[in-house]
A protein has these predicted regions:
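Glycine-aromatic micro-motifs
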Residues: 2-3
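Secondary-structure boundary elements
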Residues: 6-90
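Hydrophobic/aromatic-rich core segments of domains that either
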Residues: 100-139
Length: 139
């Protein structure tokens, strides 16, 4: 079980296609030469690359928390399960799902990143940690 929480996406190409960035489209958008093979996902680890990935993910994968209201469905935070939900079945997810899968994509692409818990602050309150965000360190 724990291993599934830190797995890489089963199919990086399918994930990139889900967010509208087939590998060749991504490389063209970044003005890079096309790779020698269709499974070469090497990209520069720059702010521009990261911005393109973040924008594509936000534009193509909606925030949704529908599964949390289904008493007969268990929400899994394992990467293969999240991948199936978001990439294969083309659904959205909530912050823990979206950020876990996006972090896994970034790691698969060679970015240095880690997860942290966050609070949603409202004036006059100090609530518990209830959200997951991804911190990316660029060279």
């Amino acid at each position: 079980m724990i291993k599934g929480l830190y797995a890489l996406p089963p199919d990086v190409g399918a994930y990139l296609a889900r967010i509208g960035l087939a590998p060749e489209d991504f490389r063209r958008a970044m003005h890079l030469e096309l790779p020698p093979s269709p499974t070469d996902y090497s990209i520069p680890h720059t702010k521009e690359s990261l911005d393109l990935l973040v924008h594509a993910h936000l534009f193509h994968v909606p925030f949704e928390n529908i599964d949390g209201y289904d008493l007969h469905r268990e929400v899994s935070l394992e990467i293969p399960d999240i991948f199936d939900k978001i990439v294969t079945r083309r659904r959205g997810g909530y912050c823990f799902e979206l950020n876990a899968l996006f972090s896994a994509l970034l790691e698969a692409l060679g970015f240095s990143c880690y997860a942290v818990g966050q609070r949603v602050l409202r004036e006059g309150s100090f609530p518990p940690v209830s959200h997951r965000v991804t911190v990316v360190t660029l060279p």
